[in-house]
A protein has these predicted regions:
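Short amphipathic helix-loop junctions that connect adjacent transmembrane helices
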Residues: 1-10, 128
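Cytoplasmic membrane-interface "Motif A"-like loop-to-helix N-cap segments
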Residues: 35-49
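Multi-pass alpha-helical transporter architecture, strongest
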Residues: 59-63, 89, 133, 138-164
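A late C-terminal transmembrane helix in Major Facilitator Superfamily
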Residues: 98-130
Length: 164
């Protein structure tokens, strides 16, 4: 609300729409990775993260007073971000023997939470507090691009294939 001048009610609705948009987005991402990309998780993750990056840039560069575009950007980010998160866990399950699936799922969940959710809040909060939202959005954009590069590394990999 500091930068975009949202009131508390509008912020609540924006957050609600962001979260709920993730449900169909995650389902679509999984469907595309299975059907369109024939079990390859990399392309679906890459294209969804490309969309996230675009919506982050739109949200960042949109001046205050255009709440509809801010909300559209947040809905777009919410729709697109949870699919790649799901694909990371799915890739871990795809790439390990069945007897190690529980361990792989547990470790990706643990490290995803510790280094993703917790560290992201700490690091982004620190950056924004000390350097401002401009640098915060630079950080978010760079991280989104790095995520796209990570998905490129698995572009042609499927299930139990050998990983180079």
């Amino acid at each position: 609300s500091d930068e975009k001048h949202f009131d508390l009610s509008a912020s609540g609705w924006a957050y609600f729409l962001y979260e709920w948009a993730g449900i169909p987005g995650t389902l679509l991402c999984g469907y595309l990775s299975d059907k369109l990309f024939k079990g390859r998780r990399g392309p679906a993750g890459f294209f969804f993260m490309l969309g996230v990056t675009i919506f982050i840039l739109i949200y960042w560069l949109n001046p205050p007073g255009h709440a509809w575009l801010d909300n559209l950007s947040l809905i777009g980010i919410g729709f697109l971000i949870y699919g790649p998160v799901m694909l990371i866990g799915l890739q871990a399950l795809d790439y390990v023997p069945k007897k190690a699936a529980g361990t792989a799922a547990g470790l990706t969940g643990l490290f995803g939470y510790l280094f993703g959710a917790v560290m992201a809040n700490i690091v982004l909060g620190f950056v924004v507090q000390h350097f401002g939202w401009h640098i915060g959005f630079v950080l978010l954009t760079v991280i989104s691009i790095l995520a796209m590069l990570c998905f490129i590394l698995t572009w042609n990999k499927r299930g139990q294939e050998q990983i180079d």
